[in-house]
């Protein structure tokens, strides 16, 4: 049986997710109520039976470190592990200078473990994937590198590495974040083939390429710009079509679902994808669960049913986590993390509320993301007057209001 190792790159700063990333790395941002973004890649690896994982961290990693240590305890008796790898300056007094450099500075891990194949996956995407099917493709093609790819609308091409392939799936072109007209999928001028940032290497090839790249002073030391863009011209680089990946328990509608949640708008929409009656991505797949830390909180509680004065505790088309209390208020099309309290006569609509938030009586909240440890005073209105909101909060061009972690909001704002 082949020896496998997963290197999970979780050191991303996530500037486009500011202010959600002011105090945490992007993979540590909460998602779907009770998860962190990093849980999706780790769950995919665990469900695929790849049980040796190194999580490479750097930027504001305390929250991420704490989460991984609490949630991801595999059994050492079977040599299974999820281990954190902080920046250690092993090759000199410098931090990681790119995703490829993060691997170079930790090559000792790979050479010590001696895997036959090494997965190098990002930690900031939402999806389900059986990574062993990618391995089967890699072996079948006798590839040295396999890149997972997904079709995207052509107008989004400037945000991704865009790939061109031949009829056998071999990479024949690659441009990182093209600023001019990108290559489209043959027969489909509306879509491009984008790299998912997930790579599978034959380990010998990985070590050779990483060492070669480290010795190039002109390199950006980035997997897309530097490794893939160079390697496909010289070696056997193939592209795995993620749309072919079949996950147990997944509906046909969910197949191929993958979201880069690197911007506020993309993050918000991916969360909203979860609350539909028939969602395009369901958290309720027992055959391929998303694992996370288990809280010792009581069940969610809904209280008051006074229809005559509109004091009814209810939630519709929403995800409400453990420890929440919906007290005579209405939550609609929203996601609540643990220990959120929504008090009487308040309404929360199309919003994402992080842990330990209190929403006062008669508040009206719409299209907002509220970070942890925020107390919203009674009668506060958010999301209904963007000009007023911009004086106090961050508001995106699409009208999403973000309230940073621990922000103090004055009564009567």
From Swiss-Prot:
Homotetramer. Involved in the biosynthesis of ADP-glucose, a building block required for the elongation reactions to produce glycogen. Catalyzes the reaction between ATP and alpha-D-glucose 1-phosphate (G1P) to produce pyrophosphate and ADP-Glc. Pathway: Glycan biosynthesis; glycogen biosynthesis. One of its GO terms (biological process) is glycogen biosynthetic process. It comes from Anaeromyxobacter sp. (strain K). This is Glucose-1-phosphate adenylyltransferase. Pfam families: Hexapep_GlmU (PF24894), NTP_transferase (PF00483). GO terms for molecular function: ATP binding; glucose-1-phosphate adenylyltransferase activity. Its EC number is 2.7.7.27. The gene is glgC.
């Amino acid at each position: 049986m082949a020896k496998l190792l997963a290197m999970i790159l979780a050191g991303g700063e996530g500037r486009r997710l500011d202010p959600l990333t002011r105090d945490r790395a992007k993979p540590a941002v909460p998602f779907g109520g009770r998860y962190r973004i990093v849980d999706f890649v780790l769950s995919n690896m665990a469900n695929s039976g790849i049980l040796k994982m190194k999580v490479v961290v750097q930027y504001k990693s305390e929250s991420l470190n704490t989460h991984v240590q609490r949630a991801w305890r595999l059994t050492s008796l079977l040599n299974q592990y999820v281990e954190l790898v902080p920046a250690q300056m092993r090759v000199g007094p410098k931090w990681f200078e790119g995703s490829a450099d993060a691997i170079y500075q930790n090559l000792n891990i790979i050479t010590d473990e001696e895997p036959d194949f090494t997965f190098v996956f990002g930690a900031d995407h939402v999806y389900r994937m059986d990574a062993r099917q990618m391995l089967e493709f890699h072996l079948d093609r006798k590839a040295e590198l396999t890149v997972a790819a997904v079709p995207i609308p052509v107008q989004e091409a400037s945000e991704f590495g865009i790939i061109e392939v031949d009829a056998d799936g071999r990479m024949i072109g690659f441009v990182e974040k093209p600023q001019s007209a990108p290559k489209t999928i043959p027969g489909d001028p509306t879509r491009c083939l984008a790299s998912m940032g997930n790579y599978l290497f034959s380990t010998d090839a990985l070590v050779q390429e990483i060492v070669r790249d480290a010795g190039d002073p002109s390199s950006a030391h980035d997997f897309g710009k530097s490794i893939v863009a160079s390697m496909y011209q010289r070696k056997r680089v193939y592209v795995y079509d993620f749309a072919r990946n079949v996950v147990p328990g997944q509906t046909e509608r969910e197949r191929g679902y993958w979201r880069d949640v690197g911007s506020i708008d993309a993050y918000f929409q991916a969360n909203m994808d979860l609350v539909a009656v028939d969602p395009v991505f369901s958290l309720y797949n027992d055959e391929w669960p998303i694992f996370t830390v288990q809280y010792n909180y009581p069940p969610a509680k809904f209280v008051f049913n006074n229809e005559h004065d509109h004091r009814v505790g209810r939630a519709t088309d929403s995800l409400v986590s453990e420890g929440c209390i919906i007290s005579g208020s209405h939550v609609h099309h929203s996601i609540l993390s643990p220990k959120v309290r929504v008090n009487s006569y308040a309404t929360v609509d199309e919003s994402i509320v992080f842990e330990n938030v209190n929403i006062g009586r008669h508040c009206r909240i719409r299209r907002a993301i509220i970070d942890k440890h925020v107390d919203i005073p009674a009668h506060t209105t958010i999301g209904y007057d963007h000009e007023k909101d911009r004086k106090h909060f961050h508001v995106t061009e699409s009208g999403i209001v973000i309230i940073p972690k621990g922000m103090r909001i004055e009564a009567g704002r």
